[in-house]
Amino acid sequence: MDNLAAIILAAGKGTRMKSGIVKVMHPLAGAPMVAWPVAVARQAGAGRIVAVVGHQAERLREHFSNDADITLAVQEEQLGTGHAVACAAGDLSGFSGKVLILCGDVPLIRTETLRAMVTAHEATGAVLTVLTARQENPHGYGRIIRGFDGRVIRIVEEKDATPDERSRTEVNAGIYCAEASFLFDAVKRIGNDNAQGEYYLTDIITMANDRGLRCTAHPVADPVEVMGINDRVQLAEAARHARRRIAEEHMLNGVTLVDPAATYIDQGVVIGADTTIQPGVQIAGGCRVGEGCTIEAGAIIKGSELGDRCVVESRAVIRGCRLGSDVVIKAGTVMEDSTVMDHAAIGPMAHLRPGSELGAHVKIGNFVETKKIVMGEGSKASHLTYLGDATIGRNVNVGCGTITCNYDGVNKHRTVIGDDVFVGSDVQFVAPVTIGSNTLIAAGTTVTRDVPADSLAIARTPQINKEGWKLRKRDQ
């Protein structure tokens, strides 16, 4: 919307976090805390967003570097919320619409709440609308003081409040909708004659009333939406609420979560209908999970894409991978930055290291490790094997104990194996070496030279049987 802008207050250090990371950059369900109100402002229709930053401004600048609709205004000294808004005024010079003011450490506000507040603001003709909440324990919040007609006449901060004012339970949520023309004129006139010596944004309410302008309150239905985060205890509580919200959205879209409270799904994850997720699962980093999948207990999936009808068994770890449809990842398998095509089966207890590209119907069995390999359709390595820096064709059988010897102490070398090759057990390929198609590599062979197609390669010490040797040895 061209007539709606947003200011995100994100300049504070967050001393109570006891951290070297500025408060608003602490992660909450997969995204920095400050990213939540930014996303909600966008969804509410804000066409221009100004984030007021201070401590570790460069960290925030880097995070928002690809967001064309976000401008950063620097508040060199944190002199209060009124001063912060004044710092943003220059970036909205000439703007004449409505301005949402949000807090970077109040991440759980809903889009629907902001839209409703903007609608109410327009309907009442107010110059300022304050989002308020009823709190059983209002300690630390500014109290809402209403006039006889229900309008907001002022907000009193906790440290400046009288005992009677502190007894009130309607509090300021720190979120506002204001007319730009009024807002930017008013913040220039704010003083700092208060217990904190700060420039309170709430002082503009008194200014509006003194001019006969309307200030209204818009109550939020759920106080959780406006909970602020000041320490790691509150961060954990907010994360619990965020995960519940995320879980409910997925369940309403046809996903089965066996135990939602024990399932950890980050913001932005996409999961198809009829997928079932068991307890203890973590899905993070912008994952996409297809329809009809089963994710068993304790699995971890990060930054990956899974096709339809995949099965990820217990305690599997998948990071940065792309899986086709009908893939089975068995228990205890670890996969990193790899691609697995349709109908493949991996594990149990396999390790796919970065650069593994496995074709359709491939089988990688227990205690097999791969790295930087391309493996063709229908090939299999069923157990106890290392395949690194290799290109393996279609329908290849790799026997137990096979190793590609890819490192000579200085450089890595590749092994190339053609289609329809049978590799017996306990074979070593000393790279660089090329194996032609339709060959058989006998068990126990150490391959040091290329093998032509349609051949048998065998390289082992001849067997010698010394009859009676054991008896003679015993009698000595």
Curated annotation (Swiss-Prot):
Ubl conjugation listed as a keyword: no
Residue span of region Pyrophosphorylase: 1-232
Region (Linker) residue spans: 233-253
Cell compartment(s), UniProt: Cytoplasm
Class of enzymatic activity (EC top level): transferase
Keywords of this entry: Acyltransferase, Cell shape, Cell wall biogenesis/degradation, Cytoplasm, Magnesium, Metal-binding, Multifunctional enzyme, Nucleotidyltransferase, Peptidoglycan synthesis, Repeat, Transferase
Active site: H383 (proton acceptor)
Binding site for Mg(2+): D105, N230
Binding site for UDP-N-acetyl-alpha-D-glucosamine: 9-12, 23, 75, 80-81, 142, 157, 172, 230, 353, 371, 386, 397
Pathway assigned to this chain's UniProt record: Nucleotide-sugar biosynthesis; UDP-N-acetyl-alpha-D-glucosamine biosynthesis; N-acetyl-alpha-D-glucosamine 1-phosphate from alpha-D-glucosamine 6-phosphate (route II): step 2/2; Nucleotide-sugar biosynthesis; UDP-N-acetyl-alpha-D-glucosamine biosynthesis; UDP-N-acetyl-alpha-D-glucosamine from N-acetyl-alpha-D-glucosamine 1-phosphate: step 1/1; Bacterial outer membrane biogenesis; LPS lipid A biosynthesis
Region (N-acetyltransferase): 254-476
Example of a GO MF term: magnesium ion binding
GO process annotations (BP): cell morphogenesis; cell wall organization; lipid A biosynthetic process; peptidoglycan biosynthetic process; regulation of cell shape; UDP-N-acetylglucosamine biosynthetic process
Binding annotation for acetyl-CoA: N406, Y407, S425, A443, R460
Catalytic reaction equation(s): alpha-D-glucosamine 1-phosphate + acetyl-CoA = N-acetyl-alpha-D-glucosamine 1-phosphate + CoA + H(+); N-acetyl-alpha-D-glucosamine 1-phosphate + UTP + H(+) = UDP-N-acetyl-alpha-D-glucosamine + diphosphate
Record bears the keyword Flavoprotein: no
HAMAP family in alphabetical order: GlmU (MF_01631)
Subunit text: Homotrimer.
Family note: In the N-terminal section; belongs to the N-acetylglucosamine-1-phosphate uridyltransferase family. In the C-terminal section; belongs to the transferase hexapeptide repeat family.
Function according to Swiss-Prot or TrEMBL: Catalyzes the last two sequential reactions in the de novo biosynthetic pathway for UDP-N-acetylglucosamine (UDP-GlcNAc). The C-terminal domain catalyzes the transfer of acetyl group from acetyl coenzyme A to glucosamine-1-phosphate (GlcN-1-P) to produce N-acetylglucosamine-1-phosphate (GlcNAc-1-P), which is converted into UDP-GlcNAc by the transfer of uridine 5-monophosphate (from uridine 5-triphosphate), a reaction catalyzed by the N-terminal domain.
Name of the molecule in the record: Bifunctional protein GlmU
Organism per entry: Geobacter sulfurreducens (strain ATCC 51573 / DSM 12127 / PCA)
Gene name of this polypeptide: glmU
